[in-house]
């Protein structure tokens, strides 16, 4: 057995204990105090693993945690990207307590992505305790608002990515394949608002301007922008409008989700949505929102990075395959900044964002060993 894998297997129970502690420190994205409590604990843990932690203060979100480990044997840096905010609320751990069943640890945030943070922490601990030098200095960025769009962290993510030779993202992988992601779709979000004019639906219908009617035309037009052959989807997910059945609705609104494989498609859809014009005479159409995350692109450098990881995993005694998803992560930003990015390096798990979220316990030492060797070998 490879010495790094042997180390991880020997420390599997300690890894599990750390993960449980991280999960118990609940960290909803919008609760700065709770997120910062976990952040301070993580800073202490990474410092004990030989890394130098620095907090990047944020006013309305949790403070970002940057950790530096090295120096490496070569110039440059390798970036590891995590987030420690979750979609769950404080108190959810009482409703959905940690439990171990059939080799799985269930609990809020176990997979997304406190399991990935555990993997990263133990990768550094392993390098430190075995006296192994990473190929490049390791810079870990642990963010606090990934689940709500990363507005407070995007600039820092992109700046670090531009200085990095590779970006390794510890988001979870889905079992049993443990798929590493070489691509993700980009995302946009829009709100289409139609303003009409109210009137009595029975006595004076012609005096009104029906905002719901106008929006209905736009919804159908938006849905037709979807092109599955090239991976573009346009989804009208939430629609509101009107006040009472007997009142011509004066306002209506649609929230639109867009996914795309290329920036060319992002711009095509953006132009189409911003170009919406009223169909019902007298109505007004307003569009807010726009392009958020660029696509994480599968390219030659990304494929080479995956192939390196695949060979390391095989040498460690397990298999990983390659894939992608329509879901986005902060890896979209590192890829958009031009940094070769490999995602899905966290623990294997499923049920994300639900009370059935879990990680496969046996994947903790495997993924930590894989990440440690990727950092060691570059």
Predicted segment positions?
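Acidic/His- and Gly-rich active-site-bordering loop/insert found
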Residues: 1-108, 129-134, 331
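Metal-dependent amide/peptide-bond hydrolase catalytic core
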Residues: 1-3, 27, 45-48, 57, ...
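Short glycine-aspartate micro-motif
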Residues: 77-79, 105, 165-169, 191, ...
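Short beta-strand segments
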Residues: 81-82, 141-143, 167-171, 193-195, ...
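Glycine/serine-rich anion-binding loops at beta->alpha junctions
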Residues: 104-118, 200, 330
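Acidic/histidine-rich catalytic neighborhood of metal-dependent amide-processing enzymes
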Residues: 113-183
């Amino acid at each position: 057995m490879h010495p790094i894998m042997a180390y991880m297997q020997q420390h599997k129970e300690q890894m599990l204990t750390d993960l449980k502690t991280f999960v118990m420190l609940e960290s909803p994205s919008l609760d700065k105090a709770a997120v910062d409590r976990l952040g301070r604990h993580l800073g202490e843990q990474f410092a004990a693993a030989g890394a130098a932690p620095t907090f990047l203060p944020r006013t309305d979100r949790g403070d970002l945690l940057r950790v530096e480990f090295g120096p490496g044997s070569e110039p440059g840096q390798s970036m590891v990207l995590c987030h420690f905010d979750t979609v769950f609320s404080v108190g959810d751990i009482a409703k959905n307590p940690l439990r171990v069943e059939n080799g799985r640890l269930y609990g809020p945030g176990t997979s997304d992505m406190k399991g990935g943070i555990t993997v990263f922490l133990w990768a550094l601990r392993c390098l430190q305790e075995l006296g192994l030098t990473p190929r490049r200095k390791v810079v870990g960025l642990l963010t606090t608002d990934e689940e709500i769009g990363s507005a407070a962290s995007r600039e820092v993510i992109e700046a670090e990515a531009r200085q990095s030779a590779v970006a390794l993202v510890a988001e979870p992988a889905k079992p049993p394949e443990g798929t590493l992601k070489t691509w993700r779709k980009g995302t946009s979000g829009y709100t289409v608002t139609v303003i009409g004019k109210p009137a009595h639906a029975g006595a004076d219908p012609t005096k009104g301007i029906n905002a719901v009617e106008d929006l209905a035309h736009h919804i159908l037009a938006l849905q037709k922008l979807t092109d599955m052959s090239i991976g573009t989807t346009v989804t009208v997910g939430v629609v509101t409008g009107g006040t009472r059945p007997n009142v011509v609705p004066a306002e209506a609104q649609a929230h639109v989700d867009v996914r795309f494989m290329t920036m060319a498609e992002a711009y095509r859809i953006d132009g189409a949505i911003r170009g919406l014009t009223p169909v019902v005479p007298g109505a007004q159409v307003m569009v807010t929102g726009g392009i958020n995350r660029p696509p994480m692109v599968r390219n030659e450098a990304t494929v080479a990075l995956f192939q390196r990881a695949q060979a390391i995993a095989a040498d460690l005694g397990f298999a990983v395959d390659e894939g992608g998803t329509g879901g986005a992560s902060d890896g979209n930003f590192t890829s958009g900044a031009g940094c070769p990015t490999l995602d899905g390096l966290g623990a294997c798990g499923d049920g994300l964002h639900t009370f059935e979220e879990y990680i496969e316990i046996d994947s903790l030492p495997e993924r930590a060993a894989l990440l440690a060797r990727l950092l060691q070998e570059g």
